[in-house]
UniProtKB/Swiss-Prot annotation:
PROSITE patterns: CHAPERONINS_CPN60
Cellular component, GO, one term: cytoplasm
Name recorded for this polypeptide: Chaperonin GroEL 1
HAMAP family, per the entry: CH60
Broad EC category: isomerase
UniProt-listed PANTHER family: 60 KDA HEAT SHOCK PROTEIN, MITOCHONDRIAL
Gene: groEL1
Induction or repression: By stress.
InterPro entries: Chaperonin_Cpn60_CS (IPR018370), Cpn60/GroEL (IPR001844), Cpn60/GroEL/TCP-1 (IPR002423), GroEL-like_apical_dom_sf (IPR027409), GROEL-like_equatorial_sf (IPR027413), TCP-1-like_intermed_sf (IPR027410)
Example GO BP: protein refolding
Family label: Belongs to the chaperonin (HSP60) family.
Presence of the UniProt keyword Hydrolase in the record: no
Length: 544
C-alpha cells in the first residue's frame, strides 16, 4: 500500500476551500445571459467551447490531491443536480461555494460544525417549502418555450422547437437530440410506436420510390419464436387472406420456407404482407412485444402461455390504422388497443422506472413509455462548424431537461429572483432556533440565497449587492433582467426557472457543503517520485 499524506483541522479545511474555489471560479463565469464561454482543451480533435456548468466541472482535475478532493466534491454537486433536474448545475456550484466559504469562516471562528450543518439543513427545508409555495404550474405552450429559451442561453429558436416537440409528443413522450448533417436545426416527430427493425426482404416494399411498405388497416401477428416452416404458419395466413386485410408479422425471425412463401404470395398473388424481426433482446424483447400487443389490441402468441402458432385466430391479431416499414425501422400508427389497457401498461412502466436503480434500465423503460403513450421527437442540431454544433447541442440538452423539470414541478421567477424572495421567510424562521450555532448555520444559507443573483449581475458587469437590494425592495415577481439591464416582472418577461431545478440545486449544494464543513482530516496517496534518468540500453556496461 502506498504511503499516505494526511492533513488535519485548519490545514485540511484550507486545502478543501482552495479546491472548491478553483472549480467554482471556472464554472460560475458561465452563469446568466451574459455569462462567458469556457474553452476546454481536448487530447484529440479541436477544443470544446461550452457555457454548460457541468461540462466545465467534469473536465477539472487539480494537481494537489487534497485540493482536488474539494473540487471533486463540488463536481458531485453539479453532477447530482444534472442527474436529478438536468439543468441548474452552475447555480448549484455557486450556492455550494457560498455556503462552504461562509461556513468555513464561522468554523474558524469557533462554531460547532455539526450544529452548523443542522442549522443549514433546517434552513434549506424552510426555503424549499417557500419555493413550492411561490411555484406556478406550467399551463401554456408559451411558458414551455420561455423556460427552454432561458435554459438555451436565450436562443428563441431552440426554445420554440422544444415547446413544439413537447406539444406533439406529450410529457411522457421522448425527445432525443442528434447532430444534423446540414446547417439548419430541425424537428422530426415520429407518431405512433417506432422500433428499429426493418423488413426482412425488399420485395415487401409497396412504394418503389421511397422503398417503404405501407399497410392501411393492417392486422398484426406478434410471435416470440422463430418461424421457419410453413406448416404451423399456414392456418393463420389463410384466415388473413380470406379477410382481405394486409398483415404485419413480428417474430424473433422469419426464415427459409416461411419467408419464401410470404415473398411469393406478395409478388404473385398480391397478398399485402410484411415481415420484421422483433425489437430488443432477451427479457426486454418480450416486454416490447407485449407493449405492441397492448397497443394494437392483440395477443402475444407465446408457447410459454400455452399458445401455439397453428391455433392462432383472427381475434388474437392486433389491429392498426397504418403501418409503415422501411429498410431500417417500423412505425405502427394508431394501434386499436383499449385505452384503459394502454394507460394501465403505462402506469406499470412508470412504477418500474421509479423502482429501477440502473440508469440504463431507466432510459430503456422511458423509451418504452414514450413509444406507448406519446411518440418520439428528434431535434437535429445543425451548425456551420463541428465546434459550434457541439456547443449548440449542449444548450439543446439543457433546455430539454429544464422543460421536462418545469412540466413536472412548475415554474418560478428566474434570474435568481425566487431564492432572493425566500430571504424574508428564512429571516422570520431563524429566531425560532434555540441553538446559537444552528442559527449561524441558517444565516449562512440566508446569505447564500443571494449568491446566484449577485453572480448573474457580476457577469453582466454590475455590482451584485446593489442589484440584490433593488430586487428585495420591489414586488414579489419583479427581478433583474441582466440581458436588458432592467428591473422587470420576470413572469411577464418570460424569464423563468423550473422549480425542480432551483430546488435540486439548493438541496445538492447544501448537502455537499455541509459534509465539507464537518470534515476534519484528509487522506491522500503520496505521489511516487519518477526517476529522471533514462533506462540503460541492453548490454550497456558489458565488455565484449
Amino acid at each position: 500500500m502506498a504511503a499516505k499524506n494526511i492533513k488535519y483541522n485548519e490545514d485540511a479545511r484550507k486545502k478543501i476551500h482552495k479546491g472548491v474555489k478553483t472549480l467554482a471560479e471556472a464554472v460560475k463565469v458561465t452563469l446568466g445571459p451574459k455569462g462567458r464561454h469556457v474553452v476546454i482543451d481536448k487530447s484529440f480533435g479541436s477544443p470544446q467551447v461550452t457555457k454548460d456548468g457541468v461540462t466545465v466541472a467534469k473536465e477539472i482535475e487539480l494537481e494537489d490531491k487534497h485540493e482536488n478532493m474539494g473540487a471533486q466534491m463540488v463536481k458531485e454537486v453539479a453532477s447530482k443536480t444534472a442527474d436529478k433536474a438536468g439543468d441548474g448545475t452552475t447555480t448549484a456550484t455557486v450556492l455550494a461555494e457560498a455556503i462552504y466559504s461562509e461556513g468555513l469562516r464561522n468554523v474558524t471562528a469557533g462554531a460547532n460544525p455539526m450544529d452548523l450543518k443542522r442549522g443549514i439543513d433546517k434552513a434549506v427545508k424552510v426555503v424549499v417549502d417557500e419555493i413550492k409555495k411561490i411555484s406556478k404550474p406550467v399551463q401554456h405552450h408559451k411558458e414551455i418555450a420561455q423556460v427552454a429559451t432561458i435554459s438555451a442561453n436565450n436562443d428563441a429558436e431552440i426554445g420554440n422547437l422544444i415547446a413544439e416537440a413537447m406539444e406533439k409528443v406529450g410529457k411522457n413522450g421522448s425527445i432525443t437530440v442528434e447532430e444534423a448533417k446540414g446547417f439548419e436545426t430541425v424537428l422530426d416527430v415520429v407518431e405512433g410506436m417506432n422500433f428499429n427493425r426493418g423488413y426482412l426482404s425488399s420485395y415487401f416494399s409497396t412504394n418503389p420510390e421511397t422503398q417503404e411498405c405501407v399497410l392501411e388497416e393492417a392486422l398484426v401477428l406478434i410471435y416470440d419464436k422463430k418461424i421457419s416452416g410453413i406448416k404451423d404458419f399456414l392456418p393463420v395466413l389463410q384466415q388473413v387472406a380470406e379477410s382481405g386485410r394486409p398483415l404485419l408479422i413480428i417474430a424473433e425471425d422469419i426464415e427459409g420456407e416461411a419467408l419464401a412463401t410470404l415473398v411469393v404470395n406478395r409478388l404473385r398473388a398480391g397478398f399485402r404482407v410484411c415481415a420484421v424481426k422483433a425489437p430488443g433482446f432477451g427479457d426486454r424483447r418480450k416486454a416490447m412485444l407485449e407493449d405492441i400487443a397492448i397497443l394494437t389490441g392483440g395477443q402475444l402468441i407465446s408457447e410459454e402461455l400455452g399458445m401455439k402458432l397453428e391455433n392462432t385466430t383472427l381475434a388474437m391479431l392486433g389491429k392498426a390504422k397504418k403501418v409503415i416499414v422501411s429498410k431500417e425501422d417500423t412505425t405502427i400508427v394508431e394501434g386499436l388497443g383499449s385505452k384503459e389497457d394502454i394507460e394501465s401498461r403505462c402506469e406499470s412502466i412508470k412504477k418500474q422506472i421509479e423502482d429501477s436503480t440502473s440508469d440504463y434500465d431507466k432510459e430503456k423503460l422511458q423509451e418504452r413509455l414514450a413509444k406507448l403513450s406519446g411518440g418520439v421527437a428528434v431535434i437535429r442540431v445543425g451548425a456551420a462548424t463541428e465546434i459550434e454544433m457541439k456547443e449548440k447541442k449542449d444548450r439543446v440538452d439543457d433546455a430539454q431537461h429544464a422543460t421536462l423539470a418545469a412540466v413536472e414541478e412548475g415554474i418560478l421567477p428566474g434570474g435568481g429572483t425566487a431564492l432572493v424572495r425566500c430571504i424574508p421567510t428564512l429571516e422570520a424562521f431563524i429566531p425560532i432556533l434555540t441553538n446559537e450555532d444552528e442559527q449561524i448555520g441558517a444565516r449562512i444559507v440566508l446569505k447564500a440565497l443571494s449568491a446566484p443573483l449577485k453572480q448573474i449581475a457580476a457577469n453582466a458587469g454590475k455590482e451584485g449587492a446593489i442589484i440584490c437590494q433593488q430586487v428585495l425592495s420591489r414586488s414579489s415577481s419583479e427581478g433583474y433582467d441582466a440581458l436588458r439591464d432592467a428591473y422587470t416582472d420576470m413572469i411577464e418577461a418570460g424569464i423563468l426557472d423550473p422549480t425542480k431545478v432551483t430546488r435540486c440545486a439548493l438541496e445538492s449544494a447544501a448537502s455537499v457543503a455541509g459534509l465539507l464543513l464537518t470534515t476534519e482530516a484528509l487522506i491522500a496517496d503520496i505521489p511516487e517520485e519518477k526517476s529522471s534518468s533514462a533506462p540503460a540500453m541492453p548490454g550497456a556496461g558489458m565488455d565484449y
